[in-house]
Amino acid sequence: MYKNLLVGLGVILMSFIAVKKEPITLYIIGDSTAANKQPKSFPETGWGMELQSFFDTNVKVDNRALNGRSTKSFITEKRWDAILTSLKEGDFVLIEFGHNDEKIDKPEIGTSINEFKSNLIKYIQETQAKKATPVLLTPIARRNFKNGVLTNTHKGYPAIVRKLADSLHIPLIDMERKTSKVLMDLGDEPSKKLFNYVDSGHVNYPIGKKDDTHLSPYGAKVVAGLVAEGVKETKIGLAKYLIKK
């Protein structure tokens, strides 16, 4: 009797183990606006560092974004190849570039509009070949106010992302528009709290810092929240794992 009971319990236990699913991996590829930061850079914070807090345990965020990278250099440095080796069916890839692609005076990272488009298509097609889902993000806005009006610094690059998403039927999170709205709603001076503005005397920034591109811890949390909002709006499968806040 006891032997049969133990066998039965073993079968039940094995069934639980069998159905336990491996977490979905949510990769982030991009530049310093999303990247993980070293302690020496604090309080500069990438929005990718805050994204995990918006998802339950069914999703594991793997933030591969890195300072100074563009669609070009992320490929030439083999960083994309490293992701492809582990990318599996059911995973997702958030793709946010543009800040460095637009620096065409730096040939190692800068890309023409056409090259930017070709690189994004490569990311999309190779992600889909792995039966994973690519999600395009336009680059977040810089805090660039002129006479109280926020001005665009990204030239035609965000438009390419939007057009590709539309023509190839790829989920799009329009982070340029989302972050621009937040900045405009806050206004010139109040919006500084979203960015890496540091008073002099800080251990990492002895003479202080005024950075209108990179985020503060608060700004990273706000921007990660906008990404999560975008995931919900796209209605992709990832959305069901968002934590209700």
Positions of PLM-derived features:
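Serine-esterase "nucleophile elbow" of acetyl-processing enzymes
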Residues: 18-66, 81-89
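Bacterial Sec-dependent N-terminal signal peptides
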Residues: 1-22
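Flexible, active-site-adjacent loop/turn segments at secondary-structure boundaries
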Residues: 45, 49, 72, 177, ...
